[in-house]
Amino acid sequence: MKIKTRFAPSPTGYLHVGGARTALYSWLFARNHGGEFVLRIEDTDLERSTPEAIEAIMDGMNWLSLEWDEGPYYQTKRFDRYNAVIDQMLEEGTAYKCYCSKERLEALREEQMAKGEKPRYDGRCRHSHEHHADDEPCVVRFANPQEGSVVFDDQIRGPIEFSNQELDDLIIRRTDGSPTYNFCVVVDDWDMEITHVIRGEDHINNTPRQINILKALKAPVPVYAHVSMINGDDGKKLSKRHGAVSVMQYRDDGYLPEALLNYLVRLGWSHGDQEIFTREEMIKYFTLNAVSKSASAFNTDKLLWLNHHYINALPPEYVATHLQWHIEQENIDTRNGPQLADLVKLLGERCKTLKEMAQSCRYFYEDFAEFDADARKKHLRPVARQPLEVVRDKLAAITDWPAENVHHAIQATADELEVGMGKVGMPLRVAVTGAGQSPALDVTVHAIGKTRSIERINKALDFIAERENQQ
């Protein structure tokens, strides 16, 4: 049997981390078994579904490189198929037309709730022989079995049982002729030959209804696995108040897709004590029986740690392709300065996100208007004039410009003036970067370049001279 899974989001908003984890688990399960992964857009909610949301879902899936083998399928393009199946069910007696008014249904609901009963349709039209005009408004309901129970072996939670007496005859076609969500899902899973349905635990109550419809259609019943919810670090359901929840927001905040995938796969699944997983290792080791049935707590600090790891562990050339987007957001012209891959090597240890890296690299490519106020006050004092003049001249004398030669020039200046490296290094750092912090000074000056470094040292000397004149 060929394994076939699906990810079926509703395009009413962005792709959130809970949906992304479900997609990842479905994708991994299919890949682990050499199967296929289907993308299906469940857009039957015509009022809330938007093209922008569909695009956001696609963007998130593509950014995470969760490629699909079939689709995307759109439920709104399959209405003829759904209605054909409903008409067949009406002929076979597994569905029936219901003419009950909204007023009657509301009164029934209030009466049941007053008695402490679970609100449900009472089946009035199920056995009715009243004649109705062809154009009289009605819905179509599924004739749910009235005896026995539905039992399914959830691959994460174990056996789950529902009594059919708890399930009412759900509506499968509305008065406007449109099929409902629970019915469309069933026909889609049947037609697309889905073998394993991996989805959130909020769908558990839909499962017995969907199984009963599948059995009525004499269709195969897939295997179900319901993943627990994701909570914030306060134990409450993850929401916007906990920070970013959109996959693309994490991209915007400077996270690598490898970091988010690694974090999400471990958010409810484990393989021994291993924390870092390549995509290939995820595929190799992933099993549903290792997925926890308990809710998981989202920990941003852990994700940040993983992101920092991947910034330094992945090839700099690859990280640079993701950094490029953030550089563009900052409007930095990188034509005059180090290659982005070299920048990743320079700033990788200091920066935990690519956004932070982009926001802290401008001085490598563009001249700054002024020195940081605290740094210039502390380090661009008259006492720094001589060290800057000497190191400038030594840098100017270098004919070959590797970082080690820059280091020798700085060290030689300190030796000549008989001062500590800090007396030379700190004024030089402020002079060439405009700030009091940077990566190692020799590689920083090397990356900025000889001409630009000397120009900036001269600018710092002019600043010191002005400061001396004002005293």
UniProtKB/Swiss-Prot annotation:
MF terms in GO: ATP binding; glutamate-tRNA ligase activity; tRNA binding; zinc ion binding
Entry GO CC: cytosol
Pfam family, one: tRNA-synt_1c
Comment on bound cofactor: Binds 1 zinc ion per subunit.
Transmembrane segments: none
Record's keyword terms, sorted: Aminoacyl-tRNA synthetase, ATP-binding, Cytoplasm, Ligase, Metal-binding, Nucleotide-binding, Protein biosynthesis, Zinc
Annotated Zn(2+) binding sites: 98, 100, 125, 127
Annotated localization: Cytoplasm
Location of the motif 'KMSKS' region: 237-241
SUPFAM superfamilies, alphabetized: An anticodon-binding domain of class I aminoacyl-tRNA synthetases (SSF48163), Nucleotidylyl transferase (SSF52374)
Catalytic activity: tRNA(Glu) + L-glutamate + ATP = L-glutamyl-tRNA(Glu) + AMP + diphosphate
A GO biological process held by the record: glutamyl-tRNA aminoacylation
Enzyme kind, highest EC tier: ligase
InterPro entries the record matches: aa-tRNA-synth_I_cd-bd, aa-tRNA-synth_I_codon-bd_sub2, aa-tRNA-synth_I_CS, aa_tRNA-synth_I_cd-bd_sf, Glu-tRNA-ligase_bac/mito, Glu/Gln-tRNA-synth, Glu/Gln-tRNA-synth_Ib_cat-dom, GluQ/Sye
Extent of motif 'HIGH' region: 9-19
Assigned EC number: 6.1.1.17
Names of the cofactor(s): Zn(2+)
Superkingdom per UniProt: Bacteria
Binding annotation for ATP: 240
Function: Catalyzes the attachment of glutamate to tRNA(Glu) in a two-step reaction: glutamate is first activated by ATP to form Glu-AMP and then transferred to the acceptor end of tRNA(Glu).
Subunit structure and binding partners: Monomer.
HAMAP family for the chain: Glu_tRNA_synth_type1 (MF_00022)
Similarity remark: Belongs to the class-I aminoacyl-tRNA synthetase family. Glutamate--tRNA ligase type 1 subfamily.
Stated name of the protein: Glutamate--tRNA ligase
